[in-house]
Every structure is written in structure tokens, then in C-alpha cells.
Amino acid sequence: MPRRPPRVCSGNKPPPVPAMEPATDGLWAHSRAALARLEKLLRCSRCANILREPVCLGGCEHIFCSGCISDCVGSGCPVCHTPAWILDLKINRQLDSMIQLYSKLQNLLHDNKGSDSKDDTSRASLFGDAERKKNSVKMWFSPRSKKIRCVVNKVSVQTQPQKAKDDKAQEASVFEFVSATPPVVVSTRAKTASRTSAKKHPKKSVAKINREGNFRPETRDSRFDSKEKLKEEKVVSFSQTLVMENSRVNGEIDLLASGSVVESVFSGSFAEVSLPLAEHIVSPDTVSKSEEAPEKKVCVEDRCPVGSDGNPKGCHRPPTSTSKKCGSNVPSASGEIREPTLLAENVVLVDCSSLPSGRLQVDVTLRRQSNASDDSLSLSPGTPPSLLNNSTHRQMMSKPSTVKLSSGIPARKRNHRGETLLHIASIKGDISSVEYLLQNGNDPNVKDHAGWTPLHEACSHGHLKIVELLLQHNALVNTTGYHNDSPLHDAAKNGHIDIVKVLLSHGASRNAVNIFGERPVDYTDAENIRSLLLLPEKTDSFSTSQCSVQVNTGQRKSGPLVLIGSGLSSQQQKLLSKLETVLKAKKCAEFDNTVTHVIVPDEEAQSTLKCMLGILNGCWVLKFDWVKACLDSQEREQEEKYEVPGGPQRSRLNREQLLPKLFDGCYFFLGGNFKHHPKEDLLKLIAAAGGRILSRKPKPDSDVTQTINTVAYHAKPDSDQRFCTQYIVYEDLFNCHPERVRQGKVWMAPSTWLISCVMAFELLPLDS
């Protein structure tokens, strides 16, 4: 019997190398083979294509494209038939990022120069396949409301028929379904009926509901092609807590956290609607028809287009009340017309709380680590069709929207992160959309909830063209974002040397520090970038100040004018009241956040509470000569000539540059009694200056106190006061003085120093 050869190799013979069959000859053959194996792992379990927006049903390990499971939502896995609730749907963000990296690597290995590696491949292919797929599902999460939202869209390939000009055109039917638990009052008439009597009455048929809602019956003159077309154009509205309708009958399923009612108005013309985002695809045929028939519009801004018979087109009166949050323009039972916020086709709202599942837990991650934003916004109906057909614009519209804007109004609506359309376009690198939004009056200096501006986003993602475009439209180059990071911090941190050069040429400050005291040069190891950032500054502060004045002058003068006097005599108060009538302004007796102008009698600012609050809020602090000049000319004069110099001017420029407040990063503890400056007034000043109040006296010898790594933003760079963030304030106008403390992060400071800092709008040095 022959001996079995040993399974281990001897030390003289090297172990066999795993066989790797190269896909093609030439360079990187093994990498191509490995990429081919990776491609097999990134395929959908149903369509066997590369995953597009991968999702899992939660009950099994199979992963599908979002468009492949539209008919399986809420039923089960199409492969292993494992039951799955609709709330178990999860988007695999990590796998989506891996697919995008795979696509970029494939383009590099195969020398595919035609494709743009910067574009989002999965999203671009999704729009390309939208006309070949009938159903697509979209899920995303709202970290703030801890809810999931799901939209199943049915995209029609064939061209939408135009509505006939006569009054016999087909209209959509509106049906209403009310859930059994909890009982919901549907209309004004239904409020009079008792809830117990609802059980005695049988369910109403669809035809009866249509008759009660004064809907016209369907005629044989309809120009729709098939019965299925009629099903797709029915609008179904639900109340509060609801059951889910079949996704095959309704084109869109929307799981909102609000659980409110939305009724969508259907019109035969698709000329002007709220643009759908991402998979709400507007076909080119539909867009072309909107150009041919611009007079046919959906009800917008409390008015409806009038048809040939004198009746409003597309304005039904369903017998349900709508939620204020949804803001629908559908007429209610009382006859009110409300503005629609969603598309006029197949909208179904379902409350997540009605579905049989536990509390939804959603992981909230940092925005900059996410691959794409969860919620985006829609453009106004006045967007030109050429921009709608642009692929980059469609990539910007990557998620379903809850915003509808009328034409000519800047897109000021935000998603749950506070991002506007300009933020989304800057993140995605959509140059055409950024240019369009800026030309239509969008503010380039708007901040989201974290403090980022569109310039921050463009610098962080390396979009040089968008950075130049924003700077051309007077974007502030030194404004701070999250943790007081400037755009130069973001550009240096991500190694974008071209953007660093552009920012420096527009006056970006090299010495700007964030909340941790780090400059832009501290965030990069690249020698070419460090050499640029280590150059001495010359006129950066002057250039940025001049830029901010030019940017905000027009915006400031277009706003309301609110006046308040400080230290004025009775005669001066009468003249100020007269100026109120001349300029159609408002005069306040007490200071609030709406005040724009503080009038003082002479060339020095008053140390009154009104004047100091005006300084801290960046108001115009003007001499009384401005009032006389305005009364003489009977119009508003330029404020710059009459502004009190020093602290008031520095504060106003600081506000126009959107920089942090005076006491940003500082903490205060008020110890002892305060008589000359009341404690309540000091608390108001500290809060208005961005400082924080400590309820306990800080301990200088505490390791926790001394290890705080934040700095004061407005302290001088070469001063040790920058690292002092906790102040113990005492009253120093009396003979009794507490023991002085000046140890590390904790310093003792008199109340007069606090007042002097406010008047000068700078952190003055403390005497040792």
C-alpha cells in the first residue's frame, strides 16, 4: 500500500502560491481578477446586477437593490420568503460607499476616461434606469424624529397625455380611508356625530364617498389609455394612524413621522409641480409638455387656474382636513385652499406608529462621515427645463423632499440638518445648480444647524469651481462653522492646495483658530500647503472687513428698521419719534433682538444696558446727528458716517462676517454681591455675548478644569488669556476684595473688566 504524501511542505520547498487567474494580460492583471471577484459579491440577490442603493429586509442576509423589492415591501424576502416588516428595511450605507469606490477603481483599471469619477455612480445609474423600471422604493431615516420614511414610486415610461381643453377632461378620484384605531374625525360634519355611532353604520362604498365629495363621475370621453392608468392617477389620502395600502395600486408610499394628512391635487397637466427628488423622475416628455402648456398649473398660492368653463382646474374638495405641517393647498370642507407640498400623483401617507413594530432605533452619525445627505430639497417650479434635464442637477436631487417653493422665491427651506439647496449642490459638486441658485438670490452665507456654510462644504469636498463661484457671489471667506472651523481649515485638512490658494487670495486669515486653538497650518503635513500658510499676514483683516460691508449693505437696508434711544433727552426722544414716522420704522422702549439701530446723544457709546446690548448684538450704534440728517433729507441716510467708532464698529463687522460672539468659549461664575452693576444685568450681558454661566465656582486645582482644551476665540493670539476660559467675576468697587486667583484656566476678574470688554468689544488684558 503506497504511503500517503505528507500534507505539509518541507522547509526546502516554498509553499504553493494561491492560483490567481488574471483576467487580461498586461499591468494590474491580479487586481483586475480580484476586482472581478469583488463584483460577484456586490451583486443583487434578485436581479444579479451591481447593487444600486443596497437595502436589506432585516429578516435574512440577502441584499437587494432598492428598485428590486418594491413588490415585496411589507411581505417577505423574494429569495428565501422570510417574512419581514416594512420598518425592518435598512439602507446599507457602508456597502453603498464600497460600491462607489469599486466603480472608481474599475474606471482606473480599465482606463475608462469617459466616466466622471467624481460623480456618484450609483445615483447616476439610478436615473438612467428610471425609465426602464416601473417600481422603485426609497427609504431613509430622520435622526431628529427617530422615524423611518419609505417611498415607493411608480415611474411611467409612456408619455403623459395632455389634458383636453374642454371641460370634459378626466379628473382623478379621491378616496379617504380612516383607520379603526384610534377613531379619527375626518371632516367638519363628522365632528357632530358621536364616535359610538360609527360602529353601527356600514362602511361606505367608493362611489358613495365620491358622490358626497362632489366628484364628477368618470366619463367615457376619457383620454387615458388603460384602466391601470386610472389606478396610477388616483389620489388616496389617509388620516392620522393608518394601515398601508397596496404598493402596486398606489405609486408612492410615504412613511412620515408626523402621521398627518396630506391630500395631493391631481391635474391633467404636469406643467408646474414640486420637483420630485431622486427617484421621483420627471421624464423628458413630461418636461417638454410643461413648456408647451405653461398656462395649465397646479393650485399654487391660494389660487387655481381657470378652465374654459370658468371652473378651477384640478381643484377638488375632499371632505378631510389637512395637517398644518404638510401645508396642502387642497380645499377642505370649509372651502379653504391650502398649498400642496407633494407631487400631484399617487401620494399615500402612513404613520409609522400604526405599524406593528417596536420603537425604531436609528444610529445618528456625523454628517461629514455620511456618504450622501438623507434629506434634500426640491427646486422651485420655476426652474428651467434645461436644468431639470441636467444629470448633475438630478444627482443633487438625491432624496425625497418635503419642500415646495414658488417661482422667484429663494430656496430658504431646509432639511433636518438645516441644509439648503445650496448646501446640497455644494456637497455634490453640481456647478450648474449652484450657479442657478446664486443667480436667483440664494444667500451664499447661510448656515446649517452645525454652522457650516456652502463654502465650507465646497472646501471640504474639494470642489474648486464651486468655491470660486461662491466667492464671486460675496461668500464670506473667514466665517466659522462647527467648532469654529474656517473654510481654510477644511481645505488644509483635506489637502486641497488649489482651494487654499484661492482662499488666501480672497483674504482668508492664516491665524484663524478654532475652538481648540488650532490654526489651518496645524491640520496639514503637506509641505507645499504649510509653506503657503506660514507666510506672514498683511491686510487680511482689512480685506475681510471691507468684503463683509459690501456683502451685507443691501441686505441690511432691505430689512425692517427698529430704533431705540439710549441716554437721550426728552427733546431728542421727540425727534426720534418723528423719525419713526418719516422712515416708517418701529421704535422700542426696551431692547430686544429685533433692534437694528441704537441712538446715543454724542460721539461716545453709553454704558447703559440698552447700549451695551446693542453693541453685543452687532447693531448700528449711531450719533444723534444721524437722526437730524434723516429728518432734513426725509430719507434714510448712510449710517457709516455717523457710527460710533471703536467697539460698536468692531461688533457690527464681527456680526456681518458671521464670526463668533465676544465671549465665545468663556465661562463665568458670579461670586458675591453686586450693587453697582446688578447681577441680572451682568447675566444678560454674558448671555448676549455668547458666554456661559457656571452654577458652581470652578476649582483651580481640579484636573478636570485644567484639562479643558478649548480656547477663547477673541483673545489675542500671543496672550496666555486665550487659554483662560473660566472667570470668577466679583464686584471691585468696594473695599472688600476676594483673594486673587490666576491659575491656568481659572482667573479672577472684576465686574468693571467685564463692562470694559463689552464697550470695547474685545477681551482686554487683566492686570496681574
Swiss-Prot record:
GO terms for cellular component: BRCA1-A complex; BRCA1-B complex; BRCA1-BARD1 complex; BRCA1-C complex; cytoplasm; nuclear ubiquitin ligase complex; nucleus. The modification Phosphothreonine is found at residue 383. Residues 197-206 have a biased composition (Basic residues). The modification Phosphoserine is found at residue 380. SMART domains: ANK, BRCT. GO terms for biological process: cellular response to follicle-stimulating hormone stimulus; cellular response to ionizing radiation; cellular response to oxidative stress; cellular response to testosterone stimulus; DNA repair; negative regulation of apoptotic process; negative regulation of protein export from nucleus; positive regulation of apoptotic process. It catalyses: S-ubiquitinyl-[E2 ubiquitin-conjugating enzyme]-L-cysteine + [acceptor protein]-L-lysine = [E2 ubiquitin-conjugating enzyme]-L-cysteine + N(6)-ubiquitinyl-[acceptor protein]-L-lysine. Residues 551-644, 658-768 form the BRCT domain. Residues 319-332, 392-405 have a biased composition (Polar residues). Its main location: nucleus. Its EC number is 2.3.2.27. Residues 209-226 have a biased composition (Basic and acidic residues). Processed during apoptosis. The homodimer is more susceptible to proteolytic cleavage than the BARD1/BRCA1 heterodimer. Residues 1-20, 188-226, 307-334, 370-414 are annotated as: Disordered. There is a cross-link at residues 154, 413, 538 (Glycyl lysine isopeptide (Lys-Gly) (interchain with G-Cter in SUMO2)). ANK repeats lie at residues 417-449, 450-482, 483-515, 516-536. It comes from the Eukaryota. Residues 544-548 are annotated as: Flexible linker. E3 ubiquitin-protein ligase. The BRCA1-BARD1 heterodimer specifically mediates the formation of 'Lys-6'-linked polyubiquitin chains and coordinates a diverse range of cellular pathways such as DNA damage repair, ubiquitination and transcriptional regulation to maintain genomic stability. Plays a central role in the control of the cell cycle in response to DNA damage. Acts by mediating ubiquitin E3 ligase activity that is required for its tumor suppressor function. Also forms a heterodimer with CSTF1/CSTF-50 to modulate mRNA processing and RNAP II stability by inhibiting pre-mRNA 3' cleavage. This is BRCA1-associated RING domain protein 1.
